[in-house]
Amino acid sequence: MSLTGTDATSFELTGRTVYRRDGALRLADGTLAGADLTMIDAVTYMHRTLGLPLEEALRMASLYPAEALGIAAERGRLAHGARADLVHLGDDLSVRRTLIGGVEAWAA
């Protein structure tokens, strides 16, 4: 459902058109259908705006979803035997590089 990185202004979801407007995803009648932000934007908001400790905001974006999906043994944490999908963040929380399975996939 993510439109991040695209110029798309709408998409279909369960037979309904969802529109991208003013940082939100809405149905035709204006009902909120989601947020239009990246994961790092969500982490940054939780930390800087709501005052959540950065470590907890990062767990909310990694470990907790992996636990909910039942894949925390291999994803969402740094541990021996876990898949090495990592995001290297700068001090300003900008994404500097990403690794997928321990292999660099993108760098700024």
Locate each region found by the language model.
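His/Asp/Glu-enriched, well-ordered alpha-helical/loop segment
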Residues: S2-L89
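Short, Lys/Arg- and Gly-enriched loop/turn segments at beta-strand edges
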Residues: D92-L99
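Mg2+-dependent phosphoryl-transfer enzymes with acidic/Ser/Thr/Gly-rich catalytic loops
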Residues: W106-A107
